[in-house]
Every structure is written in C-alpha cells, then in structure tokens.
C-alpha cells in the first residue's frame, strides 16, 4: 500500500448523509464527524465537570468521534431505516463496517495502525456511549436546522431522534438538551 489512509479521509467530504430525505442543505460525513467530535468533547466535559460523574478522557472522546464514521469512506452512508431494519441486517452491516475499517487500517504505515485501530474500528470502550450520544445529538441538530429552514420533511425524524436520545438515559446528554439545545433554534441575530 502507498499509505492512502489520509487521502481517503479527505474524501469524506464527498459522502453525503440523509440520502433518503429532501434536504435544504446537504451534510457530508466530514462536517458531521467534526460536529460529533465537538459534541462528544462537550458531553464528556459536562459529565465530568458539571455532573461530577466518572468519564473517559474528553480529548479521546473527541478523537473517537472524528473517526466514528471513517468506514463509510468505503461503504457509503447507509440510511438509518435500512441499517436498523432488523437485527440480521444490523449485524451484517456492522460486519461490513468492520471489514471496511480493517481495510482502512491496512492503508496506514504499520507503525501507526495500533494507534488508530480502536478509533477506526469503534472499539473505544467507555467512550462509545458518549460518541453514540453525540452522534444522535448531531442528527437531532440537523433535524432542527432543517425545520428552522421550513423543511417539514424532518419533522418525524426530529421526534424519533429526540425519543431515541431520551432512551439513552445519558445524564450529560439530558443536561445538554435542557441547557444548550434551544439556541440551535435561533437565528444569528437572536444568538
């Protein structure tokens, strides 16, 4: 291999999300991964510094979030209704993501592979629930932004995503919802 890993990561900007929905503005997995990293870092800090709960390193949570969709460089973005249609499809797609992640790791110099392995394969232990919460929060924010632009296409997704976040029972996520989410509904002059 010619160390294609970083070049492929640069192509994240070409993989759009929400492919089954009419969007007022597109979102790619590079933008999404950045937002998830910011949110994962925030959730970990909230958990540790505001709620006083044990938490993994917030900086490592941000790094885990940066790579949480890296396998989609090779697989594309599978729409959620398909990915989670039933347990068999979910398990099969997880296997596809794992194979894609292994393939990405092969594109790194061997000396770097172990440093990236946990992040690319999402084997991040106690960081994973925070990254998953941040991922869901990012999806919710996308719904809110689309609704704010007058797009009712995201109304059902907004309700379903909010319900899914509440089911996660993550106190740091609930704190963010209660204290930080409302400003996403405001325009620039209102902020």
Regions of interest found by a model, annotated:
Residues 1-191:
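Alpha-helical, largely C-terminal catalytic domains
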């Amino acid at each position: 291999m010619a160390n294609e890993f970083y070049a492929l990561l640069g192509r994240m900007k070409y993989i759009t999300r929400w492919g089954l929905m009419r969007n007022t503005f597109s979102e790619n997995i590079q933008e999404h991964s950045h937002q998830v990293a910011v949110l994962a870092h925030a959730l970990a800090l909230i958990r540790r510094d505001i709620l006083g709960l044990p938490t993994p390193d917030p900086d490592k949570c941000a790094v885990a979030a940066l790579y949480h969709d890296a396998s989609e460089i090779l697989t594309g973005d599978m729409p959620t209704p398909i990915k989670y249609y039933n347990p068999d499809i979910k398990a099969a797609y997880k296997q596809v993501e794992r194979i894609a992640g292994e393939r990405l790791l092969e594109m790194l110099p061997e000396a770097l592979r172990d440093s990236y392995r946990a992040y690319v394969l999402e084997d991040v232990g106690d960081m994973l629930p925070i990254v998953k919460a941040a991922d869901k929060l990012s999806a919710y924010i996308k719904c809110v932004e689309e609704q704010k632009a007058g797009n009712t296409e995201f109304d059902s997704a907004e309700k379903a995503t909010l319900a899914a976040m509440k089911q996660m029972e993550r106190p740091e996520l609930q704190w963010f919802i209660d204290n930080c989410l409302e400003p996403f509904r405001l325009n620039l002059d209102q902020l």
